[in-house]
Amino acid sequence: MFKRKSTAELAAQMAKLNGNKGFSSEDKGEWKLKLDNAGNGQAVIRFLPSKNDEQAPFAILVNHGFKKNGKWYIETCSSTHGDYDSCPVCQYISKNDLYNTDNKEYSLVKRKTSYWANILVVKDPAAPENEGKVFKYRFGKKIWDKINAMIAVDVEMGETPVDVTCPWEGANFVLKVKQVSGFSNYDESKFLNQSAIPNIDDESFQKELFEQMVDLSEMTSKDKFKSFEELNTKFGQVMGTAVMGGAAATAAKKADKVADDLDAFNVDDFNTKTEDDFMSSSSGSSSSADDTDLDDLLNDL
């Protein structure tokens, strides 16, 4: 059941999450704000505490999601756990120093962070059937910063930290989305004054909410992440020979050249040659050397 927690404890958990710095597939248990035709929408939600007292009430997932060469790469990133070596995309970014050398490529493949929480939907004008129910909610850095701003305050200046997830002393969150220059803008979203969730002292009501919640720590469990080998294979399929190194890249380029030469072969010219002409030209050392080089490169892979 729910327990009162100190804001200092939550602040420590939030700091740990911020140090870990996603993408998740469509989830039926996920709540999404419905927007009107103009791209605007609003609702009132309440962030809930963790289902596990030892865990933070939020989860952070890092992912790479992009399309290249007509193929998609959408995978969670091991940097979710602070491990940058087990992600082929992170290695590609680092090896090629994309941040400094290729801003366009970097923007395409860079890490993307998503934040998750259990929420109680207080008011949802566009979908009133959701009101009073608990969902998982995915949100971005703008809202994450607003949550942190309620916790990481300047106590010396008389500010009081608020654990917005506390069922008794937390605060409802007014989620407002407006379209600005073609993008969803969350600037007008804000926390209201501290208040208890209505009827929260009723243990049966607490149990009802608690049973609808999910253990967010399962989302970031390491056994949910694919191996480097599996990710590297997928990354290579999407990126093509651009990410291949050494003999593999050379062999791929050689194979591409052979294919181009075959495509450019003049069939009409071939039909005009005699058998002697053809046999003579095909016995040349250059072609034979190219074939041998290609075979050697492929055998070395």
UniProtKB/Swiss-Prot annotation:
Q: Which UniProt keywords apply?
A: DNA damage, DNA repair, DNA replication, DNA-binding, Metal-binding, Repressor, Viral DNA replication, Zinc
Molecular function per GO: metal ion binding; single-stranded DNA binding
What does the entry note on its domains? The acidic C-terminus is involved in modulating the ssDNA binding properties. The N-terminus LAST motif is involved in the cooperative binding of the protein to ssDNA.
Residue ranges annotated as compositionally biased, kind Low complexity, are 279-289
**InterPro entries, from UniProt?**
NA-bd_OB-fold (IPR012340), Phage_T4_Gp32_ssDNA-bd (IPR012339), Phage_T4_Gp32_ssDNA-bd_sf (IPR044947), SSB_T4 (IPR046395)
Where do the record's region annotations for LAST lie?
Answer: 3-7
Write out the function statement from the record: Single-stranded DNA-binding protein that participates in viral DNA replication, recombination, and repair. Coats the lagging-strand ssDNA as the replication fork advances. Stimulates the activities of viral DNA polymerase and DnaB-like SF4 replicative helicase, probably via its interaction with the helicase assembly factor. Stimulates the unwinding activity of UvsW helicase, inhibits it DNA winding activity.
Subunit info here reads: Homodimer in the absence of DNA, monomer when binding DNA. Interacts with the DNA helicase assembly protein; a ternary complex between the helicase assembly protein, the single-stranded DNA-binding protein and ssDNA is an obligatory intermediate in the helicase loading mechanism. Part of the replicase complex that includes the DNA polymerase, the polymerase clamp, the clamp loader complex, the single-stranded DNA binding protein, the primase, the DnaB-like SF4 replicative helicase and the helicase assembly factor. Interacts (via C-terminus) with the viral SF1 dDA helicase.
Q: Name one Pfam family in it.
A: gp32
Per the UniProt entry, what species is this protein from, by scientific name?
Enterobacteria phage T4
* Gene, per the UniProt record: 32
Cite the binding residues for Zn(2+). 64, 77, 87, 90
* Region described as Disordered: 272-301
Offer one example of a GO biological process linked to this entry: DNA repair
Where are the compositionally biased (Acidic residues) regions?
A: 290-301
Taxonomic lineage: Viruses, Duplodnaviria, Heunggongvirae, Uroviricota, Caudoviricetes
Classification via HAMAP family: SSB_T4
Q: What is this protein called?
A: Single-stranded DNA-binding protein
Q: Which family does it belong to?
A: Belongs to the Tequatrovirus single-stranded DNA-binding protein family.
